[in-house]
């Protein structure tokens, strides 16, 4: 229809002139955006093609991201840059660069990025592992470091050794209970050392609840899953907002985190005072040292420090032991060589102890190779850069999320030839070579794991006890063939080998009898 010589467009249809103006406006904004960001980007590390405005948001992988970053390292080099909706992400694929930045420049690389789902909403940033660098971080770390120092951990050797023996005996008696035996015995070590609590069994709420907390932690840290991490303003939505299920999820997780940590801490405090908790333990030691000077703030710091030891030690140690078993199934020659060393050094009259560690270089090499072959945390929990920095002429802006790709560092074929093979011999029995691996596996700078000496003792005694007493052999399938599991693993902050099934066959009846005799603490 025409009116006064003009053509009227149907309702809701933009005219060509309107479309032209919109297109020009968009292109102008795009050009201005590119000009505004180009100067900064040209001196930053290289990285994959980035789209205007959204950057690399759609390219950041949610499944096994360390493998993608490892492939990108072949194209872009040892340090690469990603842009997620304006958030700079620096991925480091080189151990040398990671040490230079995160260790030597730790004063500006020790922050944590602002994690909305895990921190603001779920409350996980109260734990040391996500705590911003500052006074509270230093206080919690001091509590842990004092009780789990090289000298202090010796008083916990008997706990670790007894649990290792119960674990192996439990798997011998019930081959289908491998994972549950690993879980309950590692949890029993940590609960006794941290709180003085003796675990009652696999369904004890003092361990089932912490495992649930760790599941929530891993879920909250998964990149790209929570829209609120990309659009932080969404955290202010009312709880009843349609579609904002993340708010309800975070509320449940937060309550579970706080009530679980208070439950185990308050039990430890009361039981240490009335003499029913096993002492020494971390909480009792700190409270005794602070006698008369305990403030509510210090007590809360202790609660979260203890919770960090519990949470940080559960899944990582479980992952490492499962990876060790997988390696023994796939590389039986390594298992036999390790057993020869134990037999020669320890003999058959007793079980190995943590104090034997200096005399067992091949066993130490096996443990180190497990850390390298399947690191429990392949992509280090991100650091945050608190000031602008320059490395080898490359600009690294303040506020960047810094992600050390530990997987790539430990699978770099130029440093570790044939990286997918399990070869303890690659260290030549030298602790100096093994340290290069453990230094990467346990974190960087001021964020390095304060309980690594304790963790290494736990892993060593379990590995040595398994090798001394049992042959770890594949299960037999319905066709009578050995069923050797593939090297597959989950995704997430902490990863686990999948479908690890085996049989623990006692090497001698004497070995079984020794386990029975020694498994009671």
From Swiss-Prot:
One Pfam family matching this protein = p450
Cite the entry's keywords alphabetically: Glycoprotein, Heme, Iron, Membrane, Metal-binding, Monooxygenase, Oxidoreductase, Transmembrane, Transmembrane helix
The residues that the entry says bind heme are 449
- The glycosylation sites are 218, 274, 317
What pathway does this protein act in? Secondary metabolite biosynthesis
Enzyme class name: oxidoreductase
Source domain of life: Eukaryota
Per the record, the coiled-coil ranges are none
The record's EC number reads: 1.-.-.-
Q: How does it sit in the membrane?
A: Single-pass membrane protein
* Any single Gene Ontology cellular-component annotation: membrane
Requisite cofactors: heme
Q: Where are the transmembrane segments?
A: 12-32
Which InterPro entries does the UniProt entry name for this protein? Answer: Cyt_P450, Cyt_P450_CS, Cyt_P450_E_grp-I, Cyt_P450_sf, Cytochrome_P450_fung
Localization, UniProt: Membrane
**Sample GO molecular function, one term:** heme binding
Query: Which family does the record assign?
Result: Belongs to the cytochrome P450 family.
Q: What does this protein do?
A: Cytochrome P450 monooxygenase that is able to use anthracene, carbazole, pyrene, phenanthrene and trans-stilbene as substrates for oxidation. These multifunctional properties against a series of polycyclic aromatic hydrocarbons (PAHs) suggest that CYP105 would play important roles, at least in part, in fungal metabolic systems involved in xenobiotic detoxification.
Task: Please report the name of this protein according to its UniProt entry.
Answer: Cytochrome P450 monooxygenase 105
Q: Which organism is it from?
A: Postia placenta (strain ATCC 44394 / Madison 698-R) (Brown rot fungus)
